[in-house]
Swiss-Prot record:
Catalyzes oxygen-dependent 5-hydroxyuridine (ho5U) modification at position 34 in tRNAs. PANTHER family: RHODANESE-LIKE DOMAIN-CONTAINING PROTEIN 7-RELATED, THIOSULFATE SULFURTRANSFERASE/RHODANESE-LIKE DOMAIN-CONTAINING PROTEIN 2. It is an enzyme of class 1 (oxidoreductase). This is tRNA uridine(34) hydroxylase. GO terms for biological process: tRNA modification.
Length: 315
């Protein structure tokens, strides 16, 4: 079962890159053998990003030219397992990835709980146009399934933030919070939908009956719902060099601390604790001076690479 995102194609703007986010839960026993041909087709077409392969399917985000992305997607859909693959598109003003990585994993999204299978049991999908009504219902408890560094820059109004460091911590958070049963409806959301596939399956397994999740995730909501009708506050963290997007999937104003990979606001950049590529308000006090000197050396290499018109792989 996959979260059926509607593909929305936009006219290509010169100088922009097409970004395609995708996932598909399917029994895929030959996933290890598929790694090399998938890597090769991406490399041959100048496509970069990360794709994860596992027994349970595929997950990832890639970017490239319109033609390059179309070729890779056609290759994927030519496989019997991915004939029904649906992807989500957005744009980037610069290539948002440094390289192309196809990785073999135990799970395409890591929860670490055995026997959770979204192909068999999953929550009820809610279209973006119906989401506001659901989360405004006093009988609904809204839960953000993302990590703390993501929720720090944007959330839905009234959502409960588990403040997890990784998705692996989510099941334990649920088990430790008996009060979650106090409301009859549970509404869950994440960036693009994949974490909610497993999170809602887990909630159903834990005995929650009315479990809903936002179809297409925050990204689909930001694409379809105009700002004046939106219950979203802030920006949505994305796992590439854009760092964040806002309504209409426009690139946000956040940057990334290359020391700790946390998103930074313009206010964070003005902090005396911020040193580009070395430290920020989130990590300054957790790093030793030896760490910071190592980061400074890396930052100098990044600056030199930029002057040569190249991109340093450590950036």
């Amino acid at each position: 079962m996959t979260d059926m995102l509607t593909t929305s194609r936009r006219p290509e703007t010169p100088g922009q890159f097409l970004v395609a986010a995708l996932y598909h839960f399917i029994s895929f026993p030959r996933f290890a053998d598929f790694r090399e041909p998938l890597q090769a087709i991406c490399d041959a077409n100048g496509v970069k990003g990360t794709l994860l392969l596992a027994h349970e399917g595929i997950n990832g985000t890639i970017a490239g030219s319109e033609e390059g992305i179309a070729t890779v997607l056609a290759f994927l859909r030519a496989q019997p397992e991915f004939a029904d693959l649906v992807h989500k598109e957005s744009r980037a003003s610069a290539m948002p990835f440094l390289r192309m990585k196809v990785r073999l994993k135990k799970e395409i999204v890591t929860m670490g709980v055995e026997n959770i299978d979204p192909k068999k049991v999953v929550g009820t999908y809610v279209e973006p146009k119906d989401w506001n009504a659901l989360i405004s219902d006093p009988e609904t408890l809204v839960i953000d399934t993302r990590n703390d560094y993501e929720t720090a820059i944007g959330v839905f109004q009234g959502a409960v933030d588990p403040k997890t460091k990784t998705f692996r911590e989510f099941p334990e958070w649920v088990r430790n919070n008996s009060g979650l049963h106090n409301k009859p409806k549970i509404a869950m959301y994440c960036t693009g939908g994949i974490r909610c596939e497993k999170a809602t399956a887990f909630m159903k397994e834990q005995g929650f009956e009315e479990v809903y999740h936002l179809k297409g995730g925050i990204l689909k909501y930001l694409e379809e719902i105009p700002p004046e009708e939106s219950l979203w506050e802030g920006a949505c963290f994305v796992f590439d060099e854009r760092v964040s997007v806002t309504h209409g999937l426009q690139e946000g104003e956040h940057t990334l601390c290359h020391a700790c990979r946390q998103p930074l606001t313009t206010e964070d950049l003005r902090s005396p604790l911020h040193e580009e590529g070395v430290s920020c308000v989130n990590c300054h006090d957790t790093r030793t001076e030896e760490d910071r000197e190592r980061y400074r050396q890396r930052q100098r290499q990044i600056v030199l690479a930029k002057k040569r018109g190249a991109r340093h792989l450590g950036s």
